Each structure stands twice: as C-alpha cells, then as structure tokens.
C-alpha cells in the first residue's frame, strides 16, 4: 500500500516537512494554551484548508471538535482519515455535521452546545471565478 504522506513529500512538495513546522514548534506553548481542553467549531472543515487546520490543531488536544460542512462525503473522508492516521489525537467529543451554517438547525446545534471557545470558518464556494472563467479575471486585472 502506498504511503500518501511519503509520496507527497517525495514527488509533490519535494520537502520532508511542512513550511509551518518550525513556526508551530516555536509557538507550541502558546498554541497549547490556546487550544488544549477548548471546544472547537470548524465550519467548512471537510475542504482542503479546513481539514489541514483541523489536523494541525488536533496535536494540541482540544476537548471537543465539531465540524460543519455541506459536503457529507468530505466529512466521511475526513473522519476516516482522522481515525485511521496513526498517532492522531481525536477528542471523544468529535461530531461531524453535514449541514449548512445558514440553516436554522445550525443555530439550534450551536445553542444546544453552549457556544464554542474557538470558531474557524473555512467555508467557500466549490469553484472560484478564476477556475470557471479565466478571462473574467484577466479582464478585471488587466483592464481595471
């Protein structure tokens, strides 16, 4: 079976560690104080940026992690990834919700949980304008 992390390091990024590794290490005391035993809500957590944020934060042991995303398959992938990664800390209170944060059920969940210590919002449109229509970006950047 292929080791995905090793493959990415060797063939994609061509580096052994994250560009943020040194900063995270240098600020580990402050990050631990800010995250350890805190409740976290990550909106848009199934996407690439949100899931990377979650993985970076989990090493500092939050007491609760609630992930909200409209992409139910992405939430399932994130959950499998977190639970199958050797050495990955996942709090007992880990709940993925496939909901839109603009729906009334989001507010109901938020109030029922009594709020959160940390809220991070990485929700975004699936495709940005430049991916769909490169010429619109060209026109607005060159002719504006």
Stretches with model-predicted labels:
Residues 69-74:
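Helix N-cap at the beta1-alpha1 junction of Rossmann-like dinucleotide-binding domains, i.e.
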Residues 56-67, 83, 89-90, 99-138:
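NAD(P)H-binding glycine-rich loop region in Rossmannoid oxidoreductase-like domains
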Residues 94:
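Short, conserved active-site loop motifs that form the nucleotide-linked donor/cofactor pocket
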């Amino acid at each position: 079976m292929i080791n995905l992390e090793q493959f990415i390091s060797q063939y994609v990024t061509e580096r052994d560690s994250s560009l943020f590794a040194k900063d995270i290490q240098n600020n580990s005391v402050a990050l631990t104080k800010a995250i350890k035993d805190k409740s976290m809500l990550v909106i848009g957590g199934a996407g690439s940026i949100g899931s990377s944020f979650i993985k970076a934060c989990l090493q500092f042991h939050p007491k609760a992690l609630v992930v909200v995303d409209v992409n139910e398959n992405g939430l399932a992938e994130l959950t499998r990834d977190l639970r199958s990664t050797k050495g990955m800390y996942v709090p007992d209170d880990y709940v993925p919700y496939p909901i839109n944060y603009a729906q009334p059920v989001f507010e109901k969940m938020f109030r029922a949980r009594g709020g959160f210590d940390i809220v991070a919002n990485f929700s975004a449109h699936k495709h940005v304008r430049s991916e769909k229509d490169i010429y619109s970006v060209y026109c607005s950047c060159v002719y504006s």
